[in-house]
């Protein structure tokens, strides 16, 4: 929960994504600036918007405390033709982070590099959300485009 811990999670997440470009199918990159006094409420609103897309949250890690919930027995069967995972990375930084929309894999790679190089002293908040979370859980193509209409095919 401290800035060095958040920095480590951000770097680990962006590196994991950068190491799997063959798995990138869709992407969306957004960035914006808000006044400092609105930063927390804006971050919380974005977090709630993204988390509300989940059927349920199975694993959370807040302040280093991990908790699990949900019923792992009700998962669907994985199907290689329709199995997707969505990773959402929300970052609140003291400095402006200029990211461009990802029209292709190289632009996504550059945005991930920029995001991953955010200095720990600039990192105010971080949330990494992935869906699906459970073993064997499936996110179909229809569910993907319904929940994430801003995604662009790479």
Give, region by region, the residue ranges found by the protein language model:
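Structured extramembrane domains adjacent to transmembrane segments
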Residues: 1-145
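A cross-kingdom marker for long, charged
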Residues: 145-154
């Amino acid at each position: 929960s401290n800035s060095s811990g958040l920095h480590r999670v951000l770097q680990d997440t962006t590196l994991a994504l950068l190491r799997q470009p063959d798995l990138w199918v869709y992407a969306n990159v957004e960035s914006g600036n808000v006044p400092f006094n609105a930063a927390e409420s804006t971050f919380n609103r974005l977090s709630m918007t993204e988390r509300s897309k989940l059927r349920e949250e199975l694993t959370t890690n807040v302040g280093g405390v991990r908790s699990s919930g949900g019923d792992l027995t009700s998962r669907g069967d994985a199907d290689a033709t329709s199995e997707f995972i969505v990773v959402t990375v929300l970052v609140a930084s003291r400095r402006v982070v200029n990211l461009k929309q990802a029209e292709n894999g190289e632009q996504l790679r550059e945005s991930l590099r920029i995001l991953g190089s955010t200095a720990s002293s600039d990192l105010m908040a971080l949330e990494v959300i992935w869906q699906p979370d459970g073993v064997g859980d499936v996110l179909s193509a229809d569910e993907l485009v319904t929940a994430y209409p801003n995604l662009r095919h790479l």
